[in-house]
Amino acid sequence: MKSLSFLNHEFEAFPSPELALTDPNGLLAIGGDLRPERLLSAYYNGIFPWFNSDDPILWWSPDPRAVFIPGEIHISTSLRKYLKKQPWRITINHAFTDVMAGCAQPREKQSGTWITQEIQMAYRELHYTGHAHSIEVWEGERLIGGLYGLAIGQVFCGESMFHRKTNASKAAVAALQQHLLKMGFKLIDAQVMNSHLESLGAKAIKRIDFITLLSELRNNPVDPATWTTKEVILELE
């Protein structure tokens, strides 16, 4: 039976994602906190937090799940030509806090953000402990785009992206895909499907299939140097 669980501040195991509600799609639990152990447990089990500043903490595992296969993200010919002409520089884990702040800025036609100060503090802690990572796009010394997410074994869980110049976030996505391919990652979790993700080649798969893939990949080791601070040279041929 589908049911909504209420979490307290004592650390406890999450309920099975299969118990998540269908309306709203994927809502599994309410409450708890954003301590690193709980967040890592959530992502390890295919669950993520998503809530507005005036809501309690809400935990989700939607069905279907939006995913990318590294190597299958669509980078159009016109975008490749555009990016080749840009003097942009792309880095990994150079400005995580600034990327989160950029992602937290309200979007057009939105009055607020789900990336609250509480969320930012929690994910900065995950970054400091080597679990959360960022891709930055620079024009000179100005940060013009980027994305961030978590690495769980050979799975990258994308959280959010932003841009201050046209196509800068797409440059970050292209760099992420290139890097993950080189480092042997097998899956990118994009959480909830939308038209933008679909245009980039995201696939909607059943939650049970996502959980199966996650369980196969989450404990696989990756090169310790994967997330050292570095520059990425886009290969756009």
From Swiss-Prot:
> Which keywords does the record carry?
Acyltransferase, Cytoplasm, Transferase
Q: Does the keyword Cytoplasm apply?
A: yes
Q: State its location(s).
A: Cytoplasm
CC per GO annotation = cytoplasm
EC category? transferase
Q: Which reaction does it catalyse?
A: N-terminal L-lysyl-[protein] + L-leucyl-tRNA(Leu) = N-terminal L-leucyl-L-lysyl-[protein] + tRNA(Leu) + H(+); N-terminal L-arginyl-[protein] + L-leucyl-tRNA(Leu) = N-terminal L-leucyl-L-arginyl-[protein] + tRNA(Leu) + H(+); L-phenylalanyl-tRNA(Phe) + an N-terminal L-alpha-aminoacyl-[protein] = an N-terminal L-phenylalanyl-L-alpha-aminoacyl-[protein] + tRNA(Phe)
Which branch of life, at top level?
Bacteria
For this protein, the record's InterPro entries field holds: Acyl_CoA_acyltransferase (IPR016181), Leu/Phe-tRNA_Trfase (IPR004616), Leu/Phe-tRNA_Trfase_C (IPR042203), Leu/Phe-tRNA_Trfase_N (IPR042221)
Record EC number: 2.3.2.6
Q: Which molecular function terms from Gene Ontology are attached?
A: leucyl-tRNA--protein transferase activity
Q: Does the keyword Ribosomal protein apply?
A: no
BP GO annotations: protein catabolic process
Indicate the family of this protein: Belongs to the L/F-transferase family.
As for what it does, the entry says: Functions in the N-end rule pathway of protein degradation where it conjugates Leu, Phe and, less efficiently, Met from aminoacyl-tRNAs to the N-termini of proteins containing an N-terminal arginine or lysine.
Protein name, please?
Leucyl/phenylalanyl-tRNA--protein transferase
